[in-house]
Amino acid sequence: MDKRPSIIGRMFDRIAPTYDLLNTILSFSLDKAWRRAAINLLEIRAGDTVLDIATGTGDLALPAADGGGKVVGIDISRQMLLRALGKAEEQDLLTRYSVVQGDALSMPFRDETFNSAMVAFGIRNMNNLEAFLAEIYRVLSIRGRFSVLEFSLPERSLFRWIYVAYLTYVVPIIGGLISGDYDAYRYLRDSVTGFPVPEALEGIMKGQGFRVVLSMPIFGGISHLYLIEKR
């Protein structure tokens, strides 16, 4: 898989118009509750500065901003950011949500800028996990927390087989038909099945200086929620 930022950015530019619709369809609307759980873990207080990585169309950032946080979203895709800003305007959240187009491995923020950070379904798109986590560590304040929501693979063999079959045969067809981009949804399958298992990802997180506060499978293990803290 080619995870160069330029390639990922162009892919998300192409699927941006149907991104929210397909998230709802392919997750059976479960992704909204999962995102809310990721936000709640951070216990955001009024005035906290929060970084949302791979902010996309703002589905994680906007509820956090609505809860009182001052959220900065970064994403490599301009088209995704334009949709996020449109939704922020509709929800009257532009005073609490701003965006930056850029690479999450080299962010234009000073050290210890943010009280907390979060990412939903974006960490698997990073082409260097160690460098990405080091960059998050840099921009977080001491004891700052980072919540990570990402797809995973169920441990139970039957459920795992069903889920992989869904990713292999159903997701690319539905995603391709609606978005017009079959390759993007084949990439989704490959990026999920090729991503480190939770125990391996926890090891990478610890290797970059984080303390793992929580690591929890969701919905039988098709997604996983992590909360880590800067020491």
Model feature map: region roles:
Residues 105-116:
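A short acidic, Gly/Pro-enriched loop at the edge of an enzyme's catalytic core
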Residues 130-145:
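A short glycine-rich, Lys/Arg-flanked "PGG" loop and its adjoining helix->strand segment in the class I
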Residues 1-18, 167, 178:
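N-terminal, positively charged/glycine-rich alpha-helical extensions of SAM-dependent methyltransferases
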Residues 49-53, 57-106:
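Class I SAM-dependent methyltransferase SAM/SAH-binding core
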Residues 18, 28-48:
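Conserved alpha-helix/loop element of class I SAM-dependent methyltransferases that forms part
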Residues 115-129:
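A short SAM/SAH-binding and catalytic strip from SAM-dependent methyltransferases
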